[in-house]
Regions:
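Membrane-embedded hydrophobic alpha-helical segments
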Residues: 41-62
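Transmembrane signal-anchor/signal-peptide helices with a preference for the extracytoplasmic
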Residues: 55-76, 231
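Alpha-helical transmembrane anchor segments
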Residues: 2-32, 173-268
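Juxtamembrane/interfacial segments around transmembrane helices
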Residues: 62, 94-112, 235-247, 263-268
Length: 268
């Protein structure tokens, strides 16, 4: 609470300093610099508000777009790791291969199904999908490693499972991400000042000015809606796509179809 009061105090101090500079400066500046009315001050304020709003929007959009790209990159990393585990399981005995590949498919389907809905509605990960991933890790860790080749295959699969878990952890953080509150405060403050600009500018109310103001409001509203949509990487109308997992599922089918050929007909 003390921090908030201090910040408000700093803002008030700047307001006092600005007014002080303005009043004192008016007394010392040449009379030729003065205007006959305060229209110049109004235009200056509107220009500053416009610039402030544009700067805040640009800053917020850059932050959110980078977060969106990062969230998508995490899904790609997870999808690649899933394919790696599935493919590596081909070099394991038949019973272990079937169990591991089945768990990989189940986990991937849970992510694009129930877990995606949970992230959309609750901004968190699904415990059921986490349980499946834990079962997958246990299955890989318990696979027999009778010789050096089998041990190498198991280690490779465990490394890929670790990559899945890491990408999943990052995705969980992405699902719960929100823009810092102070940026929303600054954004809404700039929006209110911008909307009141029509009052401060002294524009006459006519059909044309009403139409232009309405269009202006639509543009401002569209910007605000877009920002809120970007602030939810895995929910809303502009969420991160499932393409990495859907591609992984397609890859699983391809690997399964080629498995007998790749193994040369040898039993696993």
């Amino acid at each position: 609470m003390l921090g908030v009061l201090m910040q408000v105090g700093v803002l008030g101090l700047f307001a006092v300093v600005a007014v002080g500079v303005f009043v004192v400066g008016d007394r010392v500046r040449p009379k030729s610099w003065r205007h006959s009315d305060d229209a110049g001050a109004g235009h200056m304020m509107l220009d500053m508000v416009n610039m402030f709003f544009a700067a805040i929007v640009a800053f917020v959009v850059v932050i959110l777009w980078e977060q969106y790209d990062t969230s998508h990159a995490h899904t790609v990393s997870e999808g690649k790791a899933l394919v790696s585990v599935y493919e590596t399981a081909n070099d394991m005995p038949a019973q272990d291969r079937k169990q591991i590949q089945s768990l990989v498919v189940d986990y991937t389907k849970q992510v694009v199904g129930d877990e995606w809905k949970v992230m959309d509605e609750q901004r968190r990960l699904s415990p059921a999908a986490q349980a499946t991933l834990d079962d997958l890790r246990q299955a890989v860790a318990s696979a027999p490693a009778a010789d050096a080749d089998a041990k190498s295959t198991q280690d490779k699969a465990l490394t890929a499972v670790d990559a899945i878990a890491e990408a999943r952890y990052d995705r969980g953080l992405d699902a719960g991400y929100r823009l810092p509150g102070f940026l929303y405060v600054a954004l809404w403050f700039a929006t209110v000042m911008l909307l009141f600009g029509t009052v401060f500018s002294g524009v006459v109310v006519t059909r044309r000015s009403i139409l232009m103001t309405g269009l202006f409001g639509v543009v401002i509203g569209a910007v605000i809606v877009a920002i809120y949509q970007l602030d939810q990487p895995f929910s809303g109308g502009n969420h991160v796509s499932k393409d990495a997992y859907e591609l992984a599922l397609a890859r699983f089918q391809h690997i399964a179809a080629d498995a007998p050929v790749a193994s040369g007909g040898n039993p696993r």
